[in-house]
Amino acid sequence: MKLLEYYVSLRLHQKENDYTDTMKITVQELADVLCCTERNIKILLKRMTAENWLTWKPGRGRGNTSTLTFHHDIRTGILEIFHQMLEKEDLNAAINLLKENLSEDIKEELHHTLNTYFGYQEKGPETAKDVLKIPMTRKLSTLDPAFVSVSSESHFARQIYDTLLQYDENEKRFDAHLAHDYDVSADGRTITFYLRKGVMFHNGKHMTSKDVRYTFQRLKDQNANSPCQWQTALVSDVRCMGPYTIQFFLKRKTRMFLHFVSSISMAVQPEDETELIGTGPFSVTEYREDVLVLEANTHYFKERAWLDRIEIWQIPQNSKVDLHYELPSSANEQAGEAVDLLQVGCNYITFNLNKDSIVHNWHFRDAIYQLFDIQLMIKELKKDKLLAATSLFPEKSIENPPAEKTLQQAAESLQATGYNGEILKVSFFDMKYSKEDAMWLKKRAESIGLNLMLHPFPLTEYYNEEVTADSDMIIMGEMFENNIVLAFINFFKHKASFVNRFLAGKEGEHVQRIVGLLMDEEDEEKQKKYMDEIEHDLHERRLVLNSYHTYRKKNFPASLKNVSMNTFGWADFRKIWIKPAVK
């Protein structure tokens, strides 16, 4: 332990035992409190005295009482130590202190202090570095592009890795990236990519066609079991035609393959090493349980990122810290433009049709549909940043608000099932908002005699299918990436999607057939019709119950430039920059 941590333990012992700022205690008792030898206790007390934290008056003789006088009351002392931890960038110790049994008023001040630590910081001055520190209240799941499925992790992976092409959703076109050009044969079944020369991975290795082939083969590997493996099904062969030329041979013509090679799942990884090594604008320099550190890639094949360093820190779930890109607040800072974002995709409930249970009964699913009155839930839980959803697309939810729902309708549908009081298991992520939704639904279900058992599980178990295999239904969310059509298809094809996992039997086959037609369709209007048909079918069959979209509004200071948020709610780290104050 560090000296600061010993001092904190001493102050916590003082608080727990209601000692005054002058505390009488033996060296042996102190050794027990701080879990060290009597000799080390004396060394620690001398060092704390030198730091002017306390005065130590040792007792005469072995076993006699010593007197400790703290120079500050416990609130002031804890806050001072907390500031020192942050000044020394010992965020681990600061976060551990937040987890201690402190009074609410002290914790409130610590959270406020921590808030100022995140956001943009400039290190220097001689070697000025732009550093962005971002808090997250949960552990990160995988950043491996072949497996990444969570929106924030997908965004971080985009900063580490690159794809052959990039898709421009607004212009509906594919732009060159790692491949500077590509050809599609007359029959549409052979696609040739021409790779840029001189592109380097973060480990210094030059990218070649062998790395692209390896990336594809790894995604296709049955043993690897990537949730995006379905994207490889239409490819019959891959051939390296030279170090910077590669060909993909398709089983049939489909433009969707260009979408696949633009997706994060096919981001290129080096043939000989896959541990977070990419070609992206940022490289991983540190990755522990509590922090991910990204440094600007100075050898990036395109324009270097303006930010020099990004740190993503895990903080306690109850932390009142919500900054992502904002600068520390300043009284003199002019307000910049607000960026509005309404989540594309939505939270939803779906049912496990792999399990032999009452969820196969339409009337039961309708009972849950009637119970899950989102407009009422938003009102009762005061969740004003939510929009009740009737579609995965917010513009459609606005045009078609939810129909009126009543407990009487829910009770009538439940009665039609012949329900006998059995317990139904509802799974959801062990997160604040998911818990609130699940508890609200459980309470409402009780009013019509429906027994629901809540099963929260951590995000780290997202890919473990056994964790939710015996669930009857799940409360989940889907946030779409900028490539909307691909994101929609992924919702049904991606193995980590609970709609893909749970939608089984004839219902699943029917939906997958229409998804297949959507994949082969190139006309934009016809694509919309297929997506409308799928959503309508899911609604009528009560297979996916849309709940709400999340509305986000971010206000950025005027000095934060080039901010444009993607559908995940993140700004592209490689583009944002801080305009320095000029005196």
Tell what function each PLM region has.
Residues 67, 228-271, 286:
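Surface-exposed binding/hinge segments that line
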Residues 103, 492-557:
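Extracytoplasmic/peripheral linker and loop segments enriched in polar/acidic and small residues
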Residues 20-23, 33, 42-44, 149, ...:
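Aromatic- and charge-enriched surface segment that lines or borders ligand/interaction sites
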Residues 135-184, 569:
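N-terminal lobe/hinge region of extracytoplasmic solute-binding protein
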Residues 299-339, 343:
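Ligand-site clamp/hinge motif
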Residues 19-28, 34-39, 43, 52-58, ...:
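Ligand/substrate-recognition segments at binding pockets and active sites
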Residues 556-583:
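Long beta-strand-rich cores associated with HINT superfamily self-processing modules
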Residues 361-443:
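Append "and occasionally in soluble cytosolic enzymes with long acidic Gly/Pro-rich linkers
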